[in-house]
């Protein structure tokens, strides 16, 4: 009996060991999934602006970032007028042991009344020097050219020398302005750098005794996007361009609201001559105790004209957001009285004229004078940013009455508050349905699990009601506003799963954008962010690449697909009626590979399938300056001769199949 039991046990053990690899493989690869795509019954059209971008000046995204001015506080208009400017006290650059002098700020007989402050350096001895520290340093590339300029007035010294020094104090570039007189004039010279510095300084030296007056001191790269004199930083715009975004929402965000109405964003102060654009404190100056930024202001070198121009450059529809008479409801919640809204409504009407009006109109003429006689083709405006409640609705009605009467062609985007659920959200949606609003902006900064479990969020939205703008969203690895949030593969792939739901419901969801877009690695206030940069370099995060592969592979019509979301598999399908391609997106949120078969009804393709894959077996994987494409798209192909296409989905992967559909 014992012997029989031992022999039986040995036989079962051998059988178990023989079958173990097959069992493990079956569990590891999971059951083969069938992805059924019915091309014979195409659904609704998808908005051509489905996946876009949202730019807000947070994390030093504008000054110190997309707008590549290297001099901080160039017009001396910060609350502390000498912010960013320093004498050589306790600091010695090579050859700059500065003789005595002093810096003072004045307002008599200014360059203009909009920005009245200017600097008066006085040299007691020849060789007096002072410097600007830039935006967490001044970054310059060896061999590159930079335009050094300033408005100068002087009855004394006739020259001003400029040197750029690296982190060790070594001079890596120099130039000189000269020929001053006692009237304000702009002078410039081009400086070629002979070495690279990530955190350099701009030093200014007066070689004669006496004083001179300085304003709008600038060090600006010559090589900008499209080589414009007041252009944008090339590498950052290239990353935006590569997204092929359907729209550009600007300039915010909470900076539209301001802490107080006096510090709200006013678009009219951001156009025209750059030296006359009124400097303003940034809303994110001191929002978070853990990331204070007392030197965070807005010069508006990047203003509404430049935003419209950027949208045009990258092929995106412009979506400006305007203050509706309400300051940030998380701060002062200050509200303009209903009988004081004329100024706010006038701003909206004048903006339409600035963007679309004839050159014979006042604001259309300004657009033409700035170099763009053709209209910018504005089709939509946001009324308020992240507002909610009865006061908001009252003010929206005033805007809507005026705008719809004069410009019925302009769609109005309204807010549903800052959160994706709860009483304020539900109340706002009920109101917007009653008022037949055009587009409702929803925001969600939630956990990765929330994104995974909400892929069907829009499956049951009313198809006859307002359209949806998923205006701000990002998976938070720790929690909203946490300084410990990461841009890792887990956040990115969860967003991808959610985006399949946006795409499948493209008849309701008209637009979607990740937020925030940009962050300076040394000057951020908010994590996570799609693109990180320093003074010289930049890279896209895994979240950026998810946005890219979706925006670059969106069709023109929804195609029914099953399963939509089951067992860690999330899918969507679209047809591009222009290229005659069927695009199938499959997200495998599983640590194991998964076999699948794409079964097509309505077409029998033959030819080459283009495959784009984003994948990492490590959910904590991130990109970095040293490894900017650690998680990034890979391309491959697959030949097919039928409508039954076997595929293999990698662990934790986003895979896109572009299938011939002639």
Predicted regions and their residues:
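Bacterial N-terminal signal peptides that target proteins for export
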Residues: 2-13
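Bacterial N-terminal signal peptides
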Residues: 11-23
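Extracellular and organelle-lumenal recognition/adhesion modules and their flexible linkers in secreted
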Residues: 27-299, 317, 332-342, 349, ...
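Active-site cleft segment of glycoside hydrolase catalytic domains centered on the general acid/base Glu
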Residues: 173-177, 186-188, 221-223, 227-231, ...
């Amino acid at each position: 009996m014992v012997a029989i039991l031992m022999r039986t046990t040995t036989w079962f053990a051998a059988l178990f060991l023989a079958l173990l690899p097959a069992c493990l493989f079956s569990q590891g690869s999971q059951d083969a999934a069938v992805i059924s795509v019915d091309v014979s019954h195409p659904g609704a059209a998808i908005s051509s602006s489905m996946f876009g971008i949202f730019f807000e000046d947070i994390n030093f995204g504008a000054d110190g970032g997309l707008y590549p001015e290297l001099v901080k506080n160039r017009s001396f208009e910060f609350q502390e007028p000498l912010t960013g400017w320093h004498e050589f006290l306790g600091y010695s650059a090579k050859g700059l042991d500065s003789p005595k002098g002093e810096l003072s700020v004045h307002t008599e007989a200014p360059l203009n009344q909009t920005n009245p402050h200017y600097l008066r350096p006085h040299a007691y001895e020849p060789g007096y020097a002072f410097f600007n520290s830039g935006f967490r340093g001044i970054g310059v590339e060896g061999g590159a050219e930079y335009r050094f300029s300033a408005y100068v007035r002087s009855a004394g010294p006739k020259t001003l020398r400029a040197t750029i020094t690296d982190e060790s104090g070594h001079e890596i570039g120099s130039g000189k302005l000269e020929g001053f007189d006692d009237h304000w004039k702009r002078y410039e010279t081009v400086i070629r750098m002979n070495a690279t510095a990530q955190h350099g300084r701009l030093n200014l030296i007066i070689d004669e005794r006496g004083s001179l007056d300085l304003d709008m001191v600038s060090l600006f790269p010559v090589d900008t996007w499209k080589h414009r004199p007041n252009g944008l930083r090339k590498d950052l715009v290239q990353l935006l361009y590569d997204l092929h975004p359907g729209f550009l929402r600007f300039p915010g965000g909470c900076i539209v609201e301001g802490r107080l109405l006096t510090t709200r964003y006013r678009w009219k102060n951001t156009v025209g001559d750059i030296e006359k654009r009124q400097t303003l404190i940034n809303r994110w100056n001191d929002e978070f105790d853990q990331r204070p930024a007392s030197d965070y202001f807005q010069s508006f070198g990047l203003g509404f004209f430049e935003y419209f121009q950027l949208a045009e450059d990258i092929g995106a529809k412009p979506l400006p957001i305007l203050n509706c008479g309400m300051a940030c409801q998380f701060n002062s919640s200050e509200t303009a009285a209903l009988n004081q809204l004329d100024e706010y409504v006038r701003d909206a009407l004048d903006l339409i004229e600035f963007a679309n009006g004839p050159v014979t109109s006042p604001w259309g003429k300004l657009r033409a004078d700035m170099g763009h006689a053709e209209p910018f083709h504005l089709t939509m405006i946001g009324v308020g940013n992240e507002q909610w409640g009865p006061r908001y609705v009252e003010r929206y009605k005033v805007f809507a009455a005026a705008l719809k009467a004069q410009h019925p062609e302009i769609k109005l985007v309204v807010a549903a508050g800052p959160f994706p659920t709860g009483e304020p959200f539900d109340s706002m949606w009920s109101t917007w349905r009653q008022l037949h609003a055009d587009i409702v902006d929803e925001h969600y900064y939630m956990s990765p699990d929330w994104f995974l479990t909400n892929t069907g969020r829009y499956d049951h939205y009313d198809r006859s009601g307002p359209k949806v703008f998923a205006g701000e969203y990002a998976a938070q690895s720790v929690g909203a506003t946490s300084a410990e949030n990461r841009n890792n593969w887990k956040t990115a792939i969860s967003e991808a799963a959610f985006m399949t739901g946006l795409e499948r419901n493209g008849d309701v969801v008209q637009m979607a954008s990740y937020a925030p877009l940009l962050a300076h690695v040394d000057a951020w206030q908010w994590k996570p962010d799609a693109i990180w940069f320093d003074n010289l370099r930049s890279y896209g995060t895994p979240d950026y690449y998810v946005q890219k592969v979706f925006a670059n592979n969106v069709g023109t019509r929804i195609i029914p697909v099953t399963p939509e979301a089951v067992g860690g598999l999330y899918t969507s399908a679209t047809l591009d009626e222009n290229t005659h391609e069927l695009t199938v997106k499959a997200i495998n949120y599983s640590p194991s590979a998964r076999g699948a078969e794409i079964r097509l009804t309505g077409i029998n393709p033959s030819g080459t399938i283009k495959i784009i894959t984003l994948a990492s077996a490590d959910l904590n994987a991130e990109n970095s300056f040293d490894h900017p494409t650690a998680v990034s798209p890979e391309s491959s192909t697959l030949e097919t001769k039928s409508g039954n296409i076997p595929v293999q989905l990698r662990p934790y992967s986003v895979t896109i199949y572009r299938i011939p559909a002639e």
